[in-house]
C-alpha cells in the first residue's frame, strides 16, 4: 500500500516541476517578443552622425547654378540648417523651365518671382493654405527652375522639430513630406529670395558624405500637368532609408 503512495507523490512533484518550467519558458518567450517589438519601432536612420556641425561647409553659389534636373540628385545627403535645427535631405523633385508642373510656367508674378532669381536662393510658397513648401532655385537668374525638398531626416534640434511639428515622435512621419519639412524649419514665405549659400538664417551645407544609392520615380501630386511631365522620372530619393514620403512603390533604383 505504501509503494503506490510514494509513486503518486513522485508523479505530483514531477508535474509541479514541469509546470514551473513551462511558466518560466513562456515568460521568457513573452519577454523576448516584447524586446523584438520594441526594437522594431526604433528609427532606421540614426539621429547622430560622425560629421560634426563645425565640419559642415556652405555650398558655393555656383553649386546651384545648373539645370534643376542635375541639381536635384546632388542635393541628396546635403544638410539644411536653421538655428539649432539640422536636417539631412533625403527626397527631392526637379522642376524645370517649360515644365507644365513648374510654377515658372506662369511667368513672373508676385508669387513666382523668387523662382526666376539666381540659383541658390530659397523659394517658399504656401500650398493649400496650410503647408510651407521649401524649394531651392536652380540655374541662372531668369530661367525659372527649382528643386522641391520633399523629405528630410533629423540630425539635430529634435526637440525644436517636434515642438514646431506639434508631434512627439522620432519616426519618419515627422519629416516625410514637404509641408512637414517647412514646418520643422519654421519657414514662411518671407524666406523666399534668401541666399542659402550665405552664413546665418537658412543654410545649405555639405557634410562630406556622398549618397551612393539613389531611387528615382515620377513626381507626386501633379496630375494637372502634361502626360510627359507627369511620367517624367524627376523625383529622387536616398535608397535604404525610411525618411521618404509616399508613394514609395513608384521609386526604382537609378
UniProtKB/Swiss-Prot annotation:
Record GO terms (molecular function): alkylbase DNA N-glycosylase activity; DNA binding
UniProt-listed Enzyme Commission number(s): 3.2.2.21
Protein species of origin: Arabidopsis thaliana (Mouse-ear cress)
Catalytic activity: Hydrolysis of alkylated DNA, releasing 3-methyladenine, 3-methylguanine, 7-methylguanine and 7-methyladenine
Lineage top rank: taxon: Eukaryota
Gene name of the encoded protein: MAG
Keywords from the named record: DNA damage, DNA repair, Hydrolase, Nucleus
Gene Ontology CC terms, in alphabetical order: nucleus
Functional description taken from the UniProt entry: Hydrolysis of the deoxyribose N-glycosidic bond to excise 3-methyladenine, and 7-methylguanine from the damaged DNA polymer formed by alkylation lesions.
Pfam families: Pur_DNA_glyco (PF02245)
Biased composition range(s): Basic residues: 1-10
Disordered: region residues: 1-20
Protein's name according to its UniProt entry: DNA-3-methyladenine glycosylase
Amino acid at each position: 500500500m505504501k509503494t503506490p503512495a510514494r509513486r503518486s507523490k513522485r508523479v505530483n512533484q514531477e508535474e509541479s516541476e514541469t509546470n514551473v518550467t513551462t511558466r518560466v519558458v513562456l515568460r521568457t518567450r513573452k519577454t523576448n517578443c516584447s524586446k523584438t517589438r520594441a526594437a522594431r519601432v526604433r528609427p532606421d536612420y540614426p539621429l547622430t552622425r560622425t560629421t560634426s556641425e563645425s565640419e559642415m561647409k556652405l555650398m558655393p553659389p555656383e553649386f546651384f547654378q545648373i539645370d534643376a534636373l542635375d541639381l536635384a540628385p546632388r542635393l541628396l545627403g546635403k544638410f539644411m540648417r536653421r538655428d539649432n535645427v539640422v536636417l539631412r535631405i533625403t527626397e527631392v523633385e526637379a522642376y524645370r523651365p517649360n515644365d507644365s508642373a513648374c510654377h515658372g510656367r506662369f511667368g513672373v508674378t508676385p508669387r513666382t518671382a523668387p523662382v526666376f532669381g539666381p540659383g541658390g536662393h530659397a523659394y517658399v510658397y504656401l500650398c493649400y493654405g496650410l503647408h510651407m513648401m521649401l524649394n531651392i532655385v536652380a540655374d541662372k537668374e531668369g530661367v525659372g527652375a527649382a528643386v522641391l525638398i520633399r523629405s528630410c531626416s533629423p540630425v539635430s534640434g529634435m526637440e525644436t522639430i517636434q515642438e514646431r511639428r506639434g508631434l512627439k515622435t522620432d519616426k519618419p512621419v515627422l519629416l516625410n513630406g514637404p509641408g512637414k519639412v517647412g514646418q520643422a524649419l519654421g519657414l514662411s514665405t518671407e524666406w523666399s529670395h534668401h541666399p542659402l549659400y550665405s552664413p546665418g538664417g537658412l543654410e545649405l551645407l555639405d557634410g562630406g558624405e556622398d549618397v551612393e544609392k539613389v531611387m528615382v520615380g515620377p513626381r507626386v501630386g501633379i496630375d494637372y500637368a502634361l502626360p510627359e511631365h507627369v511620367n517624367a522620372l524627376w523625383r529622387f530619393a536616398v535608397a535604404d532609408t525610411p525618411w521618404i514620403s509616399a508613394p514609395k512603390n513608384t521609386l526604382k533604383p537609378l
